[in-house]
Each structure stands twice: as C-alpha cells, then as structure tokens.
Amino acid sequence: MEVVEVLHMNGGNGDSSYANNSLVQQKVILMTKPITEQAMIDLYSSLFPETLCIADLGCSLGANTFLVVSQLVKIVEKERKKHGFKSPEFYFHFNDLPGNDFNTLFQSLGAFQEDLRKHIGESFGPCFFSGVPGSFYTRLFPSKSLHFVYSSYSLMWLSQVPNGIENNKGNIYMARTSPLSVIKAYYKQYEIDFSNFLKYRSEELMKGGKMVLTLLGRESEDPTSKECCYIWELLAMALNKLVEEGLIKEEKVDAFNIPQYTPSPAEVKYIVEKEGSFTINRLETSRVHWNASNNEKNGGYNVSRCMRAVAEPLLVSHFDKELMDLVFHKYEEIVSDCMSKENTEFINVIISLTKIN
C-alpha cells in the first residue's frame, strides 16, 4: 500500500464525506485560535509584509479549510489597521496528497470569498489561492517563499506504513499486545518523517517565518496508551468480528496497519531541537471529546461517521468496499458501548515555531 496514493479524506458532500463529518477537527481549529493569532500577530508586526504567503498543509476540504483562511485574514486585518497600513496581498497555498478532493474545495471558493467580504468588507487583500498536491514530507515550495505555515490534524499521518511490523497480529495500529519491535518501528518512522518535514519547511520559510502545527498526540509517555490508540483498537475489534463471521480473512487484518503516530510533547520537542532550524514559542496539549456534537444520544453514530470519513479510503485500499457499511455499523455499536462506560477524548499536541535563520 503506497500511502501517498490512498491516504485522503472522503471527498464530496455526501453522508460519509469529510466535509460533513469533521466537527472534531473544527473544534480543534477553534481551540487553537489563540496560539495561531499570537503567532500571526508576531509575524506581521515584525515584518509588515506587503505580500503574505501562507501554506495550509494537509488542508483536506470543506468548511474547516476556509475557517483557517478566515481566521488568518481577520487576524492580519485587525493588526494592520492598528498600525495604519494598507492590507497586504494574501497568497494561500492549499496542500494535500493528490487523492484529496481539490475539485470540491475550489468549487466552494467563490461562495467563501463572497461571505468573507460580507463579514469584513471589501478593503482587504486581494486574496490568491493555489492547490499544491504532494507530500509535505518532500519539498513543496521555492526557497524562502513562505511567511506562515499552518497544519491541523495532519502531521500524525506517516509517509508510509513502518517497515518490520508484520508480526503485529490482530492489531491495525500500536496496541498493548504489539511487540516492542512494532512500537520502535512506528517511532522510527515518525522521527524520520517529522525531521524531514522540519528540514523542508526550514528551506521554504523565510527568516522569522512562523509555523503553528496541531496533531493528534498523547500526554502519556506510553505510545500504546489508550488516550491515543483506543480509537483504532475499537476499529480492529470491528474488523475481527467480521473475521469471526467469515467475511474477512484473518491474514487480511493481520496485514493491515494504520500509517499514523501520535507523539507526546516530549517527543515533538526532542525532534524539533535535534533538527535545529526552529525555536519553540509554545508547546501545549488540549483535549476534545470523541463526540464533538452536542447530541449525546447519537455519540457512537457521530464518532463512527467521523472515523469513516477519515479512514474509509485506507480501508477500501485493502478490504472489500462492499463491507464498509457493515464494518462501520459494528464499529458504531462497539464505540457506543465504550462511550457509555468511559470518558473518551482525543489529545491534541499544539506547537508554535519560529524559523531561526
């Protein structure tokens, strides 16, 4: 499985689409806003750029993508008015892997721009937008061309399934039953990928450029902690139920692993300091409930739809597409039972960085 070819959120605007099932991600963007705001204010008030080049890495599609743009434009507009400056030209780069539904994203752009003008008037910008398909673990932009890099809920995804994890039987991710070699392989891949991410962004950002990165993580130093692995453990249970029913072969589940690593703040800090291109301004964690909706009765249903929007393309690349309704129906039942007994939350790691040279 080539991750770059199959990793993307469900496209379009249907019932299982990411656009309609990304309330958790929206809440996280809103929770992170004070950190984003401070980073952008510091950037603008130190450089006062006439053109502001911003990249959203792992942008996906839907309202959340435009929420980020709206936040950043409003922050800059408020700050430049304080100083009596003319509005800069905004250049937004939307980056994601090639399988992302860029068509749906750009079809929504006109309505978004019209709505933004209604809220903040006609005096800002102009704004320019481009799509940049490709892996953010490679070079994406010309040298020193960016002022600001933003990424939310993307950097926990790995560039590939780690090597040497064939013995992770019965699991689809790191779990308490995973051999130590599997845990080490996951961390090794994460360290390689995040180091590359920092290296390439340091080449693309100008001196004093900022990054605000939010990713799924954990507070515990145990990489198999329930706070980061449980959501995938429950999906493995759903798949294994279909094995018991003879609908999926056991070896198919054994051969499937999620290309993701959810780091602790200490691991993030260690890699940033080791790579050496950035100073850390802030490094924090936050929590958000699995069910971001206010409707507690349908918690399992909401979580199942959210996870389907995220994970279905990966699953379809390995399992029969016709089984997806059944997989996520079983997943909904398992998640509902779990949520009735336990407090279920995602842990977010947020880091604000400044490029040194």
Curated annotation (Swiss-Prot):
Mg(2+) binds at residues 168, 254, 256-257. InterPro entries: MeTrfase_7, MeTrfase_capping, SAM-dependent_MTases_sf. Induction: Triggered by EOBI in flowers. Fades out in flower petals after pollination, thus resulting in a decrease in methylbenzoate emission. Strongly repressed by ethylene. It catalyses: benzoate + S-adenosyl-L-methionine = methyl benzoate + S-adenosyl-L-homocysteine; salicylate + S-adenosyl-L-methionine = methyl salicylate + S-adenosyl-L-homocysteine. Its EC number is 2.1.1.273, 2.1.1.274. Pathway: Aromatic compound metabolism. The record marks 150 as: Involved in substrate discrimination. Gene3D superfamilies: Methyltransferase, alpha-helical capping domain (1.10.1200.270), Vaccinia Virus protein VP39 (3.40.50.150). The keyword Metal-binding applies. Keywords: Magnesium, Metal-binding, Methyltransferase, S-adenosyl-L-methionine, Transferase. Transmembrane segments: none annotated. Predominantly expressed in petal limbs and tubes of corollas. Converts benzoic acid into the volatile ester methyl benzoates. This scent, mostly produced in a rhythmical, diurnal manner, attracts the pollinators. Belongs to the methyltransferase superfamily. Type-7 methyltransferase family. This is S-adenosyl-L-methionine:benzoic acid/salicylic acid carboxyl methyltransferase 1. It comes from Petunia hybrida (Petunia).
